[in-house]
């Protein structure tokens, strides 16, 4: 008997292929379509998307025949626990999706972080719950890169106090992690006439060289060579607190560290100790340290942090990441595409 191959995304056994007798093909296809059409996609955002981004997400979701549910500006965890109870897909920004949230999401199949970083998702718990976790790499990389360059200008021109500063032209810029953001930083920095170096253990030298960037082969080598380092590493068990006094001590006089990555990668106690010893060093970031108040008091004219994460806070990045998240959800539910999956 000829068999009908049926790819099942909705049953929680993603990736399995089911064989259904020929005479069942028509009724099964109808059943499958009905299930897909009844799916719910929740957008849960403490910091909401721009309205134009929500409109774009809604269009993608509803064109696929799904229902869009919004939970915006929520203030209590209980609100998201209740909202995820009956949804099939979840879009978040910096919102935390931990084991408790996943426990409450009884029929959740996929969660997408609209942005590059995904340390706000408990990946092990997602895997345990058979939930696919994704990010949307590259969608906000230009926004983050532009902010990083703006922070460099702020630091070297002494906008803290309005005194005379220096120019970026001719300075040695080190890019720590040469991914989507790092590559955009390099592209923009070329326009300033900077000498550009990069260290990324996972990026071939040939890629950097083809883009006019000099590859270096250790973080210590990068920090020792450069006047300014732009930090773009993710927060992982290997990188947390890895930017420490020993590494920073390699940097030349008048050095600047720009962090638009994650605060967890900085060893805060050692950063403070280093800045107390090195009066020439400046630190600029869009991820406020836990010791922000202390650092403001100690280093008023050498330290700046934005009140909240600002790298992706542009209208363009907002729209790009939100719509990309919606498209990835539809592609996953319909076609089983796991291209941007970050858990195993």
Region locations from a protein language model:
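Phosphate/diphosphate ligand-binding glycine-rich loop within oxidoreductases
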Residues: 69, 88-165, 267
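Structural motif
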Residues: 44-48, 72, 94, 260, ...
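Phosphate-coordination loops involved in phosphoryl transfer and adenosine-cofactor binding
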Residues: 38, 108, 169-172, 245, ...
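Phosphate-binding beta-alpha-beta segment of Rossmann-like dinucleotide-binding domains, i.e.
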Residues: 129-191, 206, 332, 337-343
């Amino acid at each position: 008997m000829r068999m009908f191959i049926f790819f099942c995304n909705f049953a929680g056994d993603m990736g399995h292929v089911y064989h259904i007798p020929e005479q069942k093909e028509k009724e099964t296809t109808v059943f499958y379509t009905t299930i897909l059409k009844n799916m719910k996609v929740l957008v849960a955002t403490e910091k909401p998307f721009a309205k134009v981004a929500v409109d774009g997400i809604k269009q993608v979701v509803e064109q696929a025949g799904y229902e869009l549910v919004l939970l915006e500006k929520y203030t209590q965890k209980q609100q998201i626990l209740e909202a995820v109870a009956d949804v099939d897909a979840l879009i978040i920004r910096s919102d935390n999706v931990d084991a408790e949230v996943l426990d409450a999401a009884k029929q959740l199949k996929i969660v997408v972080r609209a942005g590059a970083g995904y340390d706000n998702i408990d990946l092990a718990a997602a895997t345990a719950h058979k939930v696919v976790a994704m990010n949307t790499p590259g969608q906000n990389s230009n926004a983050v890169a532009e902010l990083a360059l703006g922070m460099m200008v702020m630091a070297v021109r002494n906008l803290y106090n309005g005194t005379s500063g220096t120019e970026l032209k001719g300075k040695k810029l080190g890019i720590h992690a040469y991914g989507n953001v790092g590559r955009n930083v390099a592209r923009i920095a070329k326009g300033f006439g900077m000498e550009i170096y990069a260290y990324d253990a996972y990026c071939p030298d040939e890629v950097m060289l083809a883009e006019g960037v000099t590859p270096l082969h250790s973080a210590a080598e990068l920090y020792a060579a450069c006047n300014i380092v732009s930090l773009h590493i993710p927060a992982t068990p290997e990188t947390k607190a890895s930017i420490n006094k020993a590494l920073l001590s390699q940097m030349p006089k008048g050095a600047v560290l720009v962090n638009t990555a994650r605060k967890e990668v900085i060893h805060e106690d050692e950063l403070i100790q280093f800045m107390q010893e090195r009066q020439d060093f400046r630190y600029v970031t869009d991820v406020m340290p836990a010791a922000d108040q202390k650092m403001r008091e100690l280093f008023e004219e050498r330290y700046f942090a934005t009140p909240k994460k600002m790298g992706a806070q542009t209208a363009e990045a907002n729209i790009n990441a939100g719509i990309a998240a919606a498209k990835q959800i539809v592609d996953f539910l319909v076609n089983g595409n796991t291209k941007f999956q970050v858990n195993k």
